[in-house]
């Protein structure tokens, strides 16, 4: 290509990028990525480069963890002979398809409010000399572009590393290309299918329900979809074993699991699919086309109703909680909300959690993850239970004892994480002017908010189920132990807490964030497996409680002593969380 031709192409592309429609598409892309509000809303958000990097990480790490399975050196050490890459990689192929659907679906759920134009877009775009048809086409184009970019980015690392790892011992380059191409096509189409299904659900709900009803049920629908995605991911390994040994009655169930469709498509393209997988591959093509048609149709219906008629729409929920809500708060005032600070901030916090979709989604997501892991633990405990161990007189296993601890851990962790995400940060001036920063009431307030979520779990779920399963003595004892351990976890999570929930700027990303995540995983293992093992050990001989109880009391005293030795600066109320300085200087020259 000549220099003049390259310059002509560059000028043509620049002119195309400056057309009104291209600018409108760019505006729609930025609105979807950064939300519909103003840039100073201080919500949890990421830059484009950071977000794309984070989305590619799960697939990359999952591939690295498979090195010991597919590495030729490790297979040589294990004494493995002939290696069939297609058969050996079938479980992991299904896992990567599920992972692609889960990550893409999670992004669609998180950006739920930004996928379809709302009243803010109507206020900004309707007065301009732009037809509604062009606005609709620009939004649709932006959605299709982001869907493609998202599907490619989520699977970029795994689509290269996984085929190279599996086919590393193969001498044929064509074999690698076939494996890579079929894997890439399957996971990308699975990601697109997941995004379109969620978009179709969103559009159908917005088109069918009144706006207030949609806003009310939106959080519950998103939490339900998040729980479904987590359940799909957590059961991926069991599903592959089920597919490898199918029965006649399981053929219908296989057709209802959408990730199996794309696994069948992948195997069909490779030419190694049996009759069952070949039929599932046809389901993938039909399902993807159906999801695309439903998504575009539902998007058009919801666009017409929620954008062109959004001048009459009300974006906020009612400001009052009704008579029942007032009675609830008055009852809590008499029980344990003693000071005006606690009463006001408690109402503010609960109403934030119930009305803010982002905060409710955080708590619901953590709780949903706890439900999935608890259900999986319960299933494994029931399957591993020997004959005769299901009688009420038998001692419960360690897995059964850990189920309520898993639920409590993720519920408390979700509420604590939501505390750090601000809501309308510019409105915290009322707290700055009216609250004395020296009162030290932040920890008691946060503790009571977390107990408000914990107590129903203990009294409505844990106690009745344990009493029904093991009788009053064992049920009350186990519920009391769970309550004490959850209280101890609450105190640990609030050790350095010195803010009013939802009023402090979100903490910046720190280099120690990965270490914090590792500590959360270790804490989960200790809090669930460690404590349930100690409880099971004590149940075998009640005298062993003389060891368990003093150990727990000693840990409690250590925590109280650590909190008592904190300086006034560490307990003073703050509204701006200062990042840790990388380098501390003494300033011995006293220069100013």
How would you name each of these model-derived features?
Residues 145, 205, 428:
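Anion-coordinating catalytic cores for phosphoryl-, nucleotidyl-, and glycosidic chemistry
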Residues 85, 112, 127-141, 145-149, ...:
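Structured, mid-chain assembly/scaffold modules that mediate subunit interfaces
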Residues 132-164, 438-466:
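Selective transmembrane-helix segments that form parts of the transport pathway or gating/packing helices
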Residues 1-101, 105, 153-415, 460-463, ...:
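Transmembrane alpha-helical segments and their membrane-interface loop/helix boundaries
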């Amino acid at each position: 290509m000549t220099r003049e031709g390259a310059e002509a192409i560059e000028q043509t592309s620049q002119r195309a990028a400056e057309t009104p429609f291209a600018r409108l598409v760019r505006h729609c892309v930025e609105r979807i990525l950064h939300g519909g509000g103003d840039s100073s809303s201080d919500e949890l958000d990421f830059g484009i480069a950071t977000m794309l990097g984070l989305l590619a990480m799960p697939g990359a790490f999952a591939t690295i963890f498979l090195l010991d399975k597919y590495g030729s050196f490790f297979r040589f050490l294990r004494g493995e002979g002939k290696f069939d890459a297609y058969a050996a990689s079938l479980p992991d192929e299904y896992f990567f398809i599920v992972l692609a659907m889960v990550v893409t679906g999670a992004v669609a759920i998180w950006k739920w409010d930004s996928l379809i134009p709302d009243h803010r877009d109507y206020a900004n775009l309707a007065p301009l000399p732009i037809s509604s048809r062009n606005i609709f086409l620009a939004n649709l184009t932006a959605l299709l572009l982001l869907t493609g970019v998202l599907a490619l980015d989520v699977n970029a690392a795994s689509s290269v590393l996984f085929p190279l790892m599996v086919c590393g011992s193969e001498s044929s380059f064509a074999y690698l290309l076939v494996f890579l191409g079929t894997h890439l096509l399957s996971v990308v189409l699975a990601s697109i299918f997941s995004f379109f299904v969620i978009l179709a659900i969103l559009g159908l709900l917005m088109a069918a329900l009144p706006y207030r009803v949609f806003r009310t049920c939106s959080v519950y629908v998103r939490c339900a979809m998040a729980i479904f995605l987590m359940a799909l991911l957590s059961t991926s390994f069991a599903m592959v074993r089920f597919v490898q040994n199918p029965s006649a009655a399981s053929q219908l169930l296989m057709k209802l699991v959408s990730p199996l469709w794309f696994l069948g498509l992948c195997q069909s393209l490779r030419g190694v699919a049996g009759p069952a997988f070949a039929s599932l591959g046809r389901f993938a093509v039909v399902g993807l086309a159906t999801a695309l048609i439903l998504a575009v149709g539902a998007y058009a219906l919801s666009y017409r109703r929620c954008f062109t008629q959004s001048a009459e729409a009300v974006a906020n929920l009612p400001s009052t909680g009704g008579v029942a809500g007032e009675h609830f708060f008055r009852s809590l005032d008499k029980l344990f909300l003693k000071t005006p600070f606690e009463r006001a901030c408690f109402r503010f916090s609960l109403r934030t959690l119930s009305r803010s979709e982002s905060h409710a989604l955080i708590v619901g997501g953590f709780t949903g993850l706890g439900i999935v892991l608890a259900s999986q633990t319960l299933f494994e405990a029931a399957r591993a239970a020997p004959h005769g161990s299901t009688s009420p007189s038998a001692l419960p296993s360690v897995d059964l004892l850990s189920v309520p601890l898993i639920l409590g851990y993720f519920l408390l962790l979700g509420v604590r994480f939501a505390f750090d995400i601000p809501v309308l940060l510019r409105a915290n001036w009322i707290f700055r002017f009216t609250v004395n920063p020296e009162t030290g009431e932040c920890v008691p307030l946060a503790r009571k908010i977390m107990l408000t979520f914990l107590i129903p779990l203990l009294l409505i779920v844990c106690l009745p189920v344990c009493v029904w399963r093991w009788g009053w003595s064992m049920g009350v004892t186990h519920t009391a132990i769970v309550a004490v351990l959850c209280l101890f976890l609450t105190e640990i999570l609030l050790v350095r807490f010195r803010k009013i929930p939802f009023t402090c700027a979100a903490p910046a990303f720190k280099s120690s964030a990965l270490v914090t995540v590792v500590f959360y995983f270790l804490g989960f293992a200790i809090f669930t497996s460690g404590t349930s093992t100690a409880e099971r050990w004590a149940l075998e001989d009640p005298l062993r409680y003389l060891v368990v109880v003093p150990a727990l009391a000693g840990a409690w005293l250590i925590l109280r002593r650590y909190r008592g030795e904190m300086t006034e600066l560490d307990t003073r109320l703050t509204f701006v969380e200062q990042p840790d300085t990388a380098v501390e200087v003494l300033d011995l020259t006293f220069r100013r």
